[in-house]
């Protein structure tokens, strides 16, 4: 009687390799997997970052500001929903840095003053719709 020896499946091995390579690879622009390219970010211009809300999403997945410089977030709500922008040290929301006033659109806008921040990554979201979120990069 012959004992059956386990044989590795070529298909299974290739599938496993594809999963590992996919999980470890970054974006085509060199950004790590799961991160956002800063090319897509809203940036400070003359002390103001403009970001909008429409179709339950922010117009940019991230914002970029300069360390040590206060700035304003000019927020435009383009839809008939209640939205705001709030800023935290991280996604746990344990340390709130700025809670923006909620506004109802369409075509409503407000300016939020943000005090100077240290270089680093911060988290922002809409308190009413937490899936609307992004990263604020503060660069030295």
Label each residue range with its predicted role.
Residues 20-23:
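C-terminal motif of bacterial Sec signal peptides marking the signal peptidase cleavage site
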Residues 61-81, 85-86, 110-124:
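Beta-strand cores of secreted/periplasmic/IMS beta-sandwich domains, seen most often
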Residues 26-39:
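Bacterial Sec signal peptide processing site at the extreme N-terminus
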Residues 41-70:
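N-terminal edge beta-strand
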Residues 55, 75-77, 128:
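Non-cytosolic beta-sheet module surface loops
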Residues 2-14:
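Bacterial N-terminal signal peptides that target proteins for export
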Residues 25-28, 43, 57, 104-140:
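Extracellular/periplasmic metallocenter environments
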